[in-house]
Amino acid sequence: MTLVYIALGSNLASPLEQVQAAIHALGEIPHSRVVAVSSFYRTPPLGPQDQPDYLNAAVALDTTLTPDALLDHTQRIELQQGRVRKAERWGPRTLDLDIMLFGDAVINSERLTVPHYDMKNRGFMLWPLFEIAPDLHFPDGLALRAVLDNLGAEKPASW
């Protein structure tokens, strides 16, 4: 089994229900099981500010799937919950599932970049991850705690 960390975010169509349904759906992925779920956090949007706040969370998932197979499942879950992929970056969305870490793997493919390309600059991804994996080290050896301290991002409010 490989321990994978997935970031969840939603700011449309009842975010709490969206994220709860996504956590349930992640638990239904074959050859996988949810082993930890963070609290739910309220964070301001990244990019355009004329949209609702986000609900952000993190899930730890044990899986025997390949990274691409897991990505197929996370994208299927997003689509089933009404995710529409638009050219607009950082726009509002019903559900966003990002594979932040896939064990100690470093992946740079057309479909997937792991560790997530900008997670070390995003407190809304790091704080939920820190809650469920406070002793985590990134594949490059950096401690999550040190990255959070360096970023200086305040812990987000609870949802």
Task: Report residues per predicted region.
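N-terminal beta1-alpha1 ligand-phosphate binding loop
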Residues: 1-32, 37-44
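Short, structured patches in soluble enzyme cores that scaffold and shape functional sites
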Residues: 8-10, 63, 130
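Flexible, gly/pro- and Lys/Arg-enriched active-site loops
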Residues: 31, 45-54, 65-159
